[in-house]
């Protein structure tokens, strides 16, 4: 028996068929993408026109887009090429080589600092490091490592042109055939020529812990370095950074023979002293009355000591004076006495003797001794106090 069929049931779409995606034709997809791009470009052009009208000035990029849309295809290609050439020319950098030498040995020195416990120890250690003299001695005390045993050294500049402004110049020092190490040469960089060790230069950067030593070597089979190489290196770095040479140090000033020496007058001046016999002793290098004492001196120091000793011998202390002179009458009068005889006073002196000084002995007690101690002194007595 045949089962009845329902025409309405045959027209119903099963639920699983609703989830299936409809087939999209390739032509419609390409057309839709093209229309979207066209609408995007139109929106950009309309926004640029609106902003230029409202702001009072037109953006350069949007103006270029408008002009590009209004030009023919041939003019568009030439315009794009001109823009690209301008951009390449503005961003191009020129490299200029200032110096290059193929045989150089470079050693890097790094100072070894101890780890301090507190800030006070680190400050004192830093002061000791700063007080040390910079030079080859400091380089020897640091840890050394060879960064270029034998290779080329090049100094070049990168010149960047800028429109309506002076071009920028940056100098670099390059080591190695493949430019493994590049170091900028700044105006504060210090390069010193180490003449005591040969054709060597020290390069001190901002960091005092790190420094380089550059040594120029001869070519293979030749130990001599041409002089023009050193001159070219000096001319290349002296106008860029701080370059100093030990040959330019101030010479040591020679000690003068007449004005600078404080004791020179003892050798060239005449000393006239009166002895018991009344003879004069003259100390002079050329005219000396005692050649056996002065001419036998081998050095200048001995001559100075001899002259100083002779000058001291003629200065007698008060305690070494004879007892007769110590107990004699010391007169402050204007009348002079020679060998007990009175001499006429000088014409400008007063004829009257005002006072005399007589020795006086006093006794005093000392804390260190139980016996009295006699003290000798002088007492001035005026003649007005003495009754005739």
Swiss-Prot record:
GO cellular component, one term: extrinsic component of intraperoxisomal membrane
Major site of localization recorded for this protein: membrane
Keyword DNA-binding: no
Annotated coiled-coil segments of the chain: none
Membrane protein topology class: Peripheral membrane protein
Highest taxon listed in the record's lineage: Eukaryota
GO biological process assignments: peroxisome inheritance
Region: Disordered, residue numbers: 1-25
Keyword terms: Membrane, Peroxisome
InterPro entries: Inp1
Location in or out of the cell: Peroxisome membrane
Described purpose of this protein according to its UniProt entry: Required for peroxisome inheritance.
Family to which this protein belongs: Belongs to the INP1 family.
Protein name: Inheritance of peroxisomes protein 1
The organism of origin for this protein: Eremothecium gossypii (strain ATCC 10895 / CBS 109.51 / FGSC 9923 / NRRL Y-1056) (Yeast)
């Amino acid at each position: 028996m045949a089962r009845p069929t329902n025409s309405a049931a045959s027209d119903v779409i099963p639920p699983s068929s609703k989830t299936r995606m409809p087939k999209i034709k390739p032509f419609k997809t390409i057309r839709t993408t093209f229309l979207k791009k066209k609408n995007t470009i139109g929106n950009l052009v309309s926004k640029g026109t609106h902003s230029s009208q409202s702001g009072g000035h037109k953006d350069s990029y949007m103006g270029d887009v408008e002009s590009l849309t209004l030009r023919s295809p041939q003019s568009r290609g030439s315009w794009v090429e001109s823009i690209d050439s301008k951009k390449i020319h503005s961003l191009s950098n020129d490299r200029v080589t200032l110096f290059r030498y193929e045989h150089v040995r470079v050693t890097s020195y790094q100072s070894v600092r101890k780890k301090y416990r507190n800030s006070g120890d680190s400050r004192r250690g830093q002061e000791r490091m700063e007080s040390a003299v910079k030079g080859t001695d400091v380089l020897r005390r640091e840890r050394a490592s060879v960064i270029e045993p034998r290779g080329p050294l090049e100094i070049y500049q990168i010149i960047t042109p800028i429109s309506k402004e002076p071009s920028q110049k940056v100098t670099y020092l390059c080591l190695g055939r493949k430019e493994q190490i590049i170091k900028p040469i700044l105006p504060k960089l210090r390069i010193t020529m180490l003449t005591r060790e040969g054709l060597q230069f020290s390069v001190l950067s901002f960091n005092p812990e790190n420094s380089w030593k550059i040594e120029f070597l001869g070519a293979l089979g030749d130990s001599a370095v041409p002089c023009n190489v050193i001159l070219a290196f000096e001319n290349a770095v002296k106008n860029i950074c701080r370059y100093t040479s030990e040959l330019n140090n101030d010479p040591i000033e020679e000690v003068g023979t007449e004005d600078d020496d404080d004791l020179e007058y003892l050798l060239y001046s005449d000393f006239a002293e009166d002895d018991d016999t009344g003879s004069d002793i003259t100390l002079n290098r050329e005219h000396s009355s005692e050649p056996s004492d002065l001419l036998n001196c081998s050095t200048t120091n001995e001559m100075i000591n001899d002259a100083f000793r002779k000058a001291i011998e003629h200065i007698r202390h008060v305690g070494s004076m004879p007892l007769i002179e110590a107990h004699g009458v010391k007169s402050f009068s204007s009348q002079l006495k020679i060998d007990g005889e009175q001499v006429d006073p000088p014409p400008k002196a007063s004829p009257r003797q005002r006072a005399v000084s007589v020795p006086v002995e006093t006794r005093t007690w000392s804390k260190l001794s139980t016996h009295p101690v006699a003290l000798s002194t002088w007492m001035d007595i005026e003649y007005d106090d003495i009754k005739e």
